[in-house]
Amino acid sequence: ITNDVAKQIADQYQKLTGIQDGYGQPNIDNKSFGLLARIDWNINQNHKLALRYQHNNSYDDNYGVDSKTYMFTNSGYRMNNKTNSIVAELTSHLGQNLYNEFRASASFIRDHRDVAYQGPTVQIKNVRGYDQKTNITVNIGTEYSSGANYLDQDIYTFEDNLSWYLGNHTLTFGTHNEIYRMKNLFIQAVNGSWYYNSLDLFMQDKPYQYSYKYTDPELTGGDTQWAPAMKSGQFGFYAQDKWDVSNNFNLTYGLRIDIPVIFNNPTENPTFNEYAAQQGFNARVGENPSAKVLFSPRVGFRWYTNDSHKTLLRGGVGIFTGRVPFVWLSNAFNNTGMEMKGTTINKKDAEGNYLNIA
């Protein structure tokens, strides 16, 4: 868009909201700072302890623009990340044939978005007319999803592996456990979002739609930007045997068991639960699914096809499961239909066309 059109939009936005936004070239920046410290302690001949601390602090400016979208200078957001983690690892020889590795860690991750100001979000369509090839959409105001957006994660990990050497067999027994605490604030249109179908309608302040979202202060103790906390974990146990059948061939087989759990429940929604029961749905807001045990058997081999060990053939088969994306599941704590509230106002005529609501 031209500078004259940008100034026209900025002046009208200031007139409507009292907030002045820029329309020059944005200063996009990103920085990262990292720190690593480590201590190794040989306690004695059989025990060694390692402590490691890692810190990272970074930010990255984001502007969601493309060939069909123009965003004003202060309408982007800055993504901030701060991570602190500490790891302790103890390795021990427990006898002639026993070796143990114990590891514990704690990570504290803070992700949040910064915006230049908290103001209404405005979207103006068809700024250069209604030709689909040449028109453009303009966004001004606080970015739609960034006015109230942060994710705090505390992750605690405990792992232990015991190896037992028995001739041509190496047995491994272990456990890997993770505890999560997540607090996720995500409220779109927290300052209100206004939608206009053309530049002329924006100058006349005639929107076709308005939306606003918040958390109910009567249910959150007066907080209109409340974030739910979710506590969860994943517990893993495994056993494995590495069998050296010959100098050229070994076989590894074992079983891993994982148990993902959620420790707390989202808020109950009696209205929905009553309706679901009447409809015969086996679903209730406020209840988590019961923990499910995941079995993952595996087998693999390594085969040197000749004594010179120049050619190696490897293969295996098994069932593999990764970490459960608990941050996605935490959305269920946000969207119970209780704390999170919102309104959308629009008006249509008999043919389904939007009318101005101003």
Residue spans of the language-model regions?
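Aromatic- and glycine-enriched glycan-recognition loops and surfaces
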Residues: 28-34, 231, 288-296
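Short coil turns and loop connectors of transmembrane beta-barrels in diderm outer membranes
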Residues: 44-46, 95-97, 167-168, 245-247, ...
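Outer-membrane beta-barrel pore proteins
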Residues: 1, 26-29, 41-44, 304-307
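Glycine-rich, acidic and aromatic/proline-enriched surface loops and short helix-turn segments
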Residues: 6-12, 55-56, 257-262
